[in-house]
Amino acid sequence: MPRPTPGKDWLAGHRTEAAADRILDAAEELYTQRDADSIGMNEIASVAGCSRATLYRYFENREALRTAYVHRETHRLGRAIKQQIDGVDDPRERLVASIIATLRKVRDSPALASWFSITRPPTGGELAGQSEVIAALAAAFLNSLGPDDPAVVERRARWVVRVIISLLMFPGHDEADERAMIEDFVVPIVTPDTVNSARA
């Protein structure tokens, strides 16, 4: 696919959101090739077909761009996973299904999977572990499983994020093995107390 030529008309006909997405798409293309830490703003601007000045108008530095990319993909994954588990009613089964779906979708994306490769710097794990957006989405999902103390839900959400990061970086033998670990060691701790009490 031919790349656009940098110029003053780069934003012509583009809204701000569309222009930012175009830059993030360019970054994604590069993320599939090399680890994120080795990719500079010059390269991203070149692939996006815009000037450095335009790039910095949207993202003040590389860290801001990477964070924006992770958050965009998090929202996309969230919507896809929500649709996938829509027919699962049992809270415990929904939790397992959502984690398995998250692992599968990240691994199926070359750009996202590269962030969690143990042969590269742990950029993906660090960003995911520190992201308030990811933590908030995880907390909202856990809260949908059943009511519980907000502080407890927040801690459980951060724990789930760490479990997912761990499995992405250090996978189980196969999906069945990972499912068993989630059922044995995550579900009993993370599902709301009301759900566990009802199952007792």
Please annotate each region the language model reported.
Residues 48-59:
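Short hydrophobic/aromatic patch on the recognition helix
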Residues 59, 69-70:
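DNA major-groove recognition helix of helix-turn-helix
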Residues 78, 97, 122-158:
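Amphipathic alpha-helical packing segments from all-alpha helical-bundle domains
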Residues 83, 115-123:
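Short linear capping/connector segments at secondary-structure termini
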